[in-house]
UniProtKB/Swiss-Prot annotation:
Its cofactor is Mg(2+); Mn(2+). Mg(2+) 1 binds at residues 305, 319. The lineage of its organism: Bacteria, Pseudomonadati, Chlorobiota, Chlorobiia, Chlorobiales. GO terms for biological process: cell wall organization; peptidoglycan biosynthetic process; regulation of cell shape. The keyword S-adenosyl-L-methionine does not apply. The gene is ddl. Its EC number is 6.3.2.4. Mg(2+) 2 binds at residues 319, 321. This is D-alanine--D-alanine ligase. One of its GO terms (molecular function) is D-alanine-D-alanine ligase activity. Cell wall formation. Residues 146-352 form the ATP-grasp domain. GO terms for cellular component: cytosol. Belongs to the D-alanine--D-alanine ligase family. ATP binds at residues 179-234.
Length: 364
């Protein structure tokens, strides 16, 4: 059987740009090269597409080391230096799509995980690993995710959503509404970002406005959410119509909560796989993950995050990620590995699921 060509999309316009590159490097190292050839496609922070030698040079760049040693500024300086050689060149989108068989996306966050790139690929009839346009868009919006999950019978934390426009018009009114509805501490988070970017834990009224300022600067919609005192547990889901759920894994944060630094830079968080949960709680978490996955119409992959409340073992949805991290310290591949699906096999299965979905739904 001839090799198939996989377009590996990475980079993107979101604040998770660097993490996307790290994920892409891991995927490239674990793909079955006897079955697939990789054609990298790098999207810079301005949304410009770069293929060929430019994308290959960036994929070869060990940005994780640069990030640890020099911070984000040094990473972006190197990326800009490489892409400068592509200035003035016109990317031939049609020729690129004509040359590939299937796409694998490691575009985390906005403009990658929210349905935009999925719609583009659908237009060009390119199969891709992971969720489609609608499920991606729903899952990206934390408020809509909670509404869909609650409708399917999965418990969610109490929350209120605030538009950045309403907050800008009357910040004090929004702050008053929050303090009337919730007891502190609360979490303030952008509705459409991942990797814990822009999230603040607010302990009192004095901290509320700075947290809202921070989140509203990053997103047009913001969530204020009650704090759940419990264990942070995650489940990886893999499949299309008959998905499987991994063993649950627990995150013990190295800071006040599992933030961007814990996930990708200093790695102080402790990951426990499988999570030390009673058997019935573990089974219930896995079932809840499958329920959320199906309620949102997901396909291919997702990581579903929960809280297991101290004392009661109530299972409460936190969020879902339809393009979870694929770095060497990311939960999704580690959870699947602990469930018998190693990283190399995981990539192959995701690509096969993409082709399977297109075969069943040729017009989608």
């Amino acid at each position: 059987m001839p090799k198939q060509t996989v377009a590996l999309f990475f980079g993107g316009k979101s604040v998770e740009h660097i993490i996307s590159i790290i994920s892409a490097r891991a995927v490239a190292s674990h793909i079955d090269h006897s079955r697939y050839d990789i054609t990298p496609l790098y999207i810079d922070r301005g949304g410009h597409w770069h293929g060929g030698a430019c994308a290959k040079r960036i994929l070869a760049l060990d940005v994780a080391v640069l990030l640890r040693n020099g911070g984000q500024d040094e990473v972006f300086e190197r990326l800009d230096e490489i892409t400068s050689f592509d200035e003035g060149k016109r990317f031939d989108l049609t020729a690129f799509f004509d040359s590939i068989d299937v796409a694998f996306l490691t575009l985390h966050g906005s403009y990658g995980e929210d349905g935009k790139i999925q719609g583009c690929l659908d237009t060009f009839d390119i199969p891709y690993a992971g969720c489609g346009l609608t499920s991606s868009a729903l899952s990206m919006d934390k408020a809509l995710t909670k509404l869909c999950a609650a409708d399917a019978g999965v418990e969610v934390a109490g929350f209120m959503s605030v538009t950045s426009a309403d907050y800008a018009a009357d910040p004090q009114a929004i702050c008053n509404a929050v303090t009337e509805r919730f007891a502190f501490p609360v979490f303030v988070k952008p509705a459409n970002l991942g990797s814990s970017v822009g999230i603040s834990k607010v302990h009192n009224a004095a901290e509320l406005r700075p947290a809202l300022d921070k989140a509203c600067a990053l997103d047009a919609k913001v969530l204020v959410e009650e704090t759940i005192t419990g264990r942070e547990v995650e489940v990886a889901v893999l499949g299309n119509d008959d998905p499987i759920a991994s063993v649950p894994g627990e995150i013990i944060p190295g800071s006040d909560f599992y933030d961007f630094e814990d996930k990708y830079v200093k790695s102080d968080a402790k990951l426990v796989i499988p999570a030390d949960l009673p058997g019935e709680v573990s089974a219930a978490v896995r079932n809840a993950a499958l329920t959320v996955f199906k309620a949102l119409g997901c396909s291919g992959m997702a990581r579903v995050d929960f809280f297991v409340e101290h004392g009661t073992n109530r299972i409460i949805l936190n969020e879902i990620n339809t393009i979870p991290g694929f770095t060497d310290i990311s939960m999704y591949p580690m959870l699947m590995s602990a469930s018998g699906v190693e990283f190399d096999e995981l990539i192959s299965r995701l690509l096969l699921l993409a082709l399977e979905k297109r075969a069943i739904n040729p017009k989608i």
